[in-house]
Amino acid sequence: MHNIHRRHFLKAAGAVTAGLVTANIALNANASSVAPKPSSGKSVIGLIAPKMEVVRVGFIGVGERGFSHVEQFCHLEGVELKAICDTHQAVVDRAVEHIVKQKRPKPAVYTGNDLSYRELLNRDDIDIVIISTPWEWHAPMAIDTMESGKHAFVEVPLALTVEECWQIIDTAERTQKNCMMMENVNYGREELMVLNMVRQGLFGELLHGEAAYIHELRWQMKEINHKTGSWRTYWHTKRNGNLYPTHGLGPVSQYMNINRGDRFDYLTSMSSPALGRALYAKREFPADHERNQLKYINGDMSTSLIKTVKGRTIMVQHDTTTPRPYSRHNLIQGTNGVFAGFPNRIAVENDGFGTSYHKWDTDMQKWYDKYDHPLWQRIGKEAEINGGHGGMDFVMLWRMVYCLRNGEALDQDVYDGASWSVVNILSEQSLNNRSNSVNFPDFTRGAWEHAKPLGIVGA
């Protein structure tokens, strides 16, 4: 949803903050020694929905991110774009115009207020809903979607509180509907190749990973009335932690089989001073501008360390403020070698190419030739043509539709979305308690121990 009135944001953010205070107290106990929350339904690990000959799609939010999804779905076979919803008429008109230009039927439109999306959910000719709205709407919209009998596909993060995570999981288990957080980075060419390398044992036993979202986004502060910065800026005044952990953490979690043989155990976190946003506002806005009246509290650099039940470690960082090159780190270290991204480089003992592990090998072509993921081999060229973050967006949506049409389980489930997103909340709880460790809830309720690892799919 392209726009949200500031008063609605402040109300929602205030509720989140209040919830965190309560959660901080509740999670001081050792969660690892507490039995998981009982379920009112059946686990959705490996959930397979009945095959859909055609996937009928509704879109909630067609602004920045949502419009990109509309564009990509227009390139996919076996889908119908049935309805769209947004509070901002201009982006609704743009989406409708684009769909019609692609020679697809004109979708139904729902707009007018923040709850117009419920009219879309009342339709009986929609199978899945793509949710691309401000963060505070993700959980309630996902829950409403599943309650309406539809599968929910949600932009990142999945939720903003531990309780929201549990509510989403409980709803998915009770309704037996998919709720997938659309972590597109898991479908990048490099990430898929590294997953293939890991599954073939190239790095030996895994020990350590590093993940990040380092992306200078101060310029979004100039988006005042519409677009992402019109609402995301305020989160830097409400929270102090890792606001956006999933882009880097998703791939590393899949390398390590998190929730499929291992799981996150506990986390410790700290943040640097919060200086950059205020300095930017002072430089770029008039002294009496609202951006200069805000108190920015989110540390410019957030660093968290995660320990898994199997003893592995993961560093997760967040920085959208300081001037530096983009990075997600994407590092995975095993007993036989290491891969690191940004830029891509690898060092492996006995790598088969006669290269010494004492220095980085940056010639990636031979590695692509040997380990390129079958999924990218099949549709990589089409993905590069259609775009979307280098093609990863197209691959993700293509794979979602393929699974739904062919009766296969999705690659990411609701437990993944909750586990990766909850770093947002736990990092803040740790920071507020002098960086003492905070335990992860076991969102799978113990099922992680027997869940099948994500394989190397060929379609």
Curated annotation (Swiss-Prot):
Its EC number is 3.2.1.49. Predicted to be exported by the Tat system. The position of the signal peptide cleavage has not been experimentally proven. Keywords: Glycosidase, Hydrolase, NAD, Signal. Residues 1-31 form the signal peptide. InterPro entries: Gfo/Idh/MocA-like_OxRdtase_N, Gfo/Idh/MocA_oxidrdct_glycsds, Glyco_hydro_109_C, NAD(P)-bd_dom_sf, TAT_signal, TAT_signal_bac_arc. The keyword NAD applies. GO terms for molecular function: alpha-N-acetylgalactosaminidase activity; nucleotide binding. It is an enzyme of class 3 (hydrolase). It comes from the Bacteria. Binds 1 NAD(+) per subunit. The NAD(+) cannot dissociate. It catalyses: Cleavage of non-reducing alpha-(1->3)-N-acetylgalactosamine residues from human blood group A and AB mucin glycoproteins, Forssman hapten and blood group A lacto series glycolipids. NAD(+) binds at E64, R65, D86, W135, E136, W137, H138, E155, V156, N184, Y244. Its cofactor is NAD(+). Substrate binds at Y213, R232, Y244, P245, T246, H247, Y326. Belongs to the Gfo/Idh/MocA family. Glycosyl hydrolase 109 subfamily. NCBIfam families: TAT_signal_seq. Glycosidase that has specific alpha-N-acetylgalactosaminidase activity. This is Alpha-N-acetylgalactosaminidase. It comes from Shewanella oneidensis (strain ATCC 700550 / JCM 31522 / CIP 106686 / LMG 19005 / NCIMB 14063 / MR-1).
